[in-house]
């Protein structure tokens, strides 16, 4: 399988500089706009997203394909559930 950074995405959410709860609120809107099975890349700088985004995915049954940290930036690849 490809590395997440090489996978084509259906949308990107840049939440750089935003603090809780804004990244998750924006994520909710962006994921809603994706087609079922669509892949969203999220870029964030708020450390609380390490806790909040995985919980968001579990609660709403989306797949957290991968998450990475690169020099204080948090990257997430989320596949929208197909329901």
From Swiss-Prot:
Chain's role: Sulfur carrier protein which probably makes part of a sulfur-relay system.
Keyword Signal: no
NCBIfam families reported in the protein's UniProt record: PRK00299.1
Localization in the cell: Cytoplasm
Active site: 20
One term of GO molecular function: sulfur carrier activity
Cystine crosslinks: none
CDD domains attached to this UniProt entry: SirA
Protein name in the entry: Sulfur carrier protein TusA
Family annotation (SUPFAM superfamilies): SirA-like
Primary residence: cytoplasm
Keywords, alphabetical: Cytoplasm
Family: Belongs to the sulfur carrier protein TusA family.
């Amino acid at each position: 399988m490809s590395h997440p950074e090489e996978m084509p995405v259906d949308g990107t959410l840049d939440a750089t500089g935003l603090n809780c709860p804004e990244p998750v609120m924006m994520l909710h809107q962006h994921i809603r706009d994706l087609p079922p099975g669509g892949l969203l890349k999220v870029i964030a700088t708020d450390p609380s997203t390490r806790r909040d985004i995985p919980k968001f995915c579990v609660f709403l049954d989306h797949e957290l394909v991968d998450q990475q940290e690169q020099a204080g930036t948090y990257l997430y690849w989320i596949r929208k559930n197909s329901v």
